[in-house]
Amino acid sequence: MKLLEQIEKWAIETPDQTAFVWRDAKITYKQLKEDSDALAHWISSEYPDDRSPIMVYGHMQPEMIINFLGCVKAGHAYIPVDLSIPADRVQRIAENSGAKLLLSAATVTVTDLPVRIVSEDNLKDIFFTHKGNTPNPEHAVKGDENFYIIYTSGSTGNPKGVQITYNCLVSFTQWAVEDFNLQTGQVFLNQAPFSFDLSVMDIYPSLVTGGTLWAIDKDMIARPKDLFASLEQSDIQVWTSTPSFAEMCLMEASFSESMLPNMKTFLFCGEVLPNEVARKLIERFPKATIMNTYGPTEATVAVTGIHVTEEVLDQYKSLPVGYCKSDCRLLIMKEDGTIAPDGEKGEIVIVGPSVSVGYLGSPELTEKAFTMIDGERAYKTGDAGYVENGLLFYNGRLDFQIKLHGYRMELEEIEHHLRACSYVEGAVIVPIKKGEKYDYLLAVVVPGEHSFEKEFKLTSAIKKELNERLPNYMIPRKFMYQSSIPMTPNGKVDRKKLLSEVTA
């Protein structure tokens, strides 16, 4: 598959087909091509000998997609940066990535960034003044060059830039279109922010099949009335989200085939799909196919998939995450470095062309997590699991990294920032489960000196500081104050004891 050519084909064959919809804003495939060509031409003229990544800032604006394609047509990887990401984290991404340029689809509130900022108005001028110019196709990102870089949580307090190449993305997109039986011209739900790699599961499968991306933003999600009004208008046929988002939608009685009569496929990734959520979806959408998938950002969105039927639900209380895509393979590694036999638990290692080339500017972290096996790139996921008859079962994290509401985070990073707060002497983050999946984060804090009379005022002050350093989804929901943190005999935090204390 020639990814960019495949997307551009629709600008010629169906130029007026809508490529992307967000509220009242929409763009056609013709406009997507013209504006991304104009932008790529401008980037190439401004930075003729430069291939540094470009930051793309915004939320669900159509310009985000235009900017992504404009960057890669000019030979630059893009770094999606959502509006919700705090200033301090944006600053660290800018510094780590070596980006020289930031394209903005929304007002940039972060100050003193070491990059040139192209505002919304500047972008419109570029689209207008460079209209009709086409970039040199030889300049476009190809092969093992980076297509996008997504920053994920890092245990040192610094986010890690996962480099995904053109070949990685082509491998994923081709597999998704074929294995999930995606058809030409379908409407895809776009619920995940672009800085979360779940969004890649809908963006490129939609664009290469001439589909329409229907974007739902965070404000809509916060207002159910607006959310369901939008869904009712959408005629979505391919649903891509975390299971948590679907579970929230199922709380609305009208969320069913009557609201979305042409729903054909549910694609789930990012966290555990509970058996009962899948069962309810089958009841509400009897004609739709439900696919459960698995994969870390470092292996390009997902590498396994399984069609969840009533038979599968009856057979497994905890659902399997699927069979591996044909060009990759899964190894289950035991602690001694040998491969575990069928049915035995160990660390999931992914091998093949979906695997990232590593973390940008972090050779030590890359060496720790990535390796070569039989001449192919391999990623040690840190996830526990086992394979039985080719079917992968996921058993949670081996370390302190978890997925909460679809967002992957390292508890050590949150602890790092929490301990840096005023009024905090010591802190441990305890993820609290509800059934099979994590429900919220509890911060167990040993407070330092403070003058607050009430605990809730202390909590407010700590949360205020955390909001300046971490995205909202990484802020603990509850706080508990103790005089000390339990330790193991070898001087480590006794997390098992702490968990038993807080859940007793």
Curated annotation (Swiss-Prot):
GO BP term, example: lipoteichoic acid biosynthetic process
Reactions catalysed according to its record: holo-[D-alanyl-carrier protein] + D-alanine + ATP = D-alanyl-[D-alanyl-carrier protein] + AMP + diphosphate
Uppermost EC category: ligase
GO CC annotation terms, alphabetical: cytoplasm
A GO MF term: ATP binding
Keywords, ordered alphabetically: ATP-binding, Cytoplasm, Ligase, Nucleotide-binding
Nucleotide-binding found in the keyword field: yes
Gene3D superfamilies: 3.30.300.30, N-terminal domain of ligase-like
Binding locations of D-alanine: D197, V301, K492
Cleaved signal peptide residues: none
Pathways involved: Cell wall biogenesis; lipoteichoic acid biosynthesis
Location, primary (coarse class): cytoplasm
Cross-referenced Pfam families: AMP-binding, AMP-binding_C
Entry annotated with the keyword Amino-acid biosynthesis: no
Residues annotated for ATP binding in this entry: T152, S153, N292, T293, Y294, G295, P296, T297, D383, Y394, N395, G396, R397, K492
EC assignment: 6.2.1.54
SUPFAM superfamilies, A to Z: Acetyl-CoA synthetase-like
CDD domains to which the protein is assigned, alphabetical: DltA
Membership in a protein family: Belongs to the ATP-dependent AMP-binding enzyme family. DltA subfamily.
HAMAP family registered for this protein in UniProt: DltA
NCBIfam families: AA-adenyl-dom, D-ala-DACP-lig, PRK04813.1
Protein's name in the database: D-alanine--D-alanyl carrier protein ligase
Taxonomic source organism: Bacillus cereus (strain ZK / E33L)
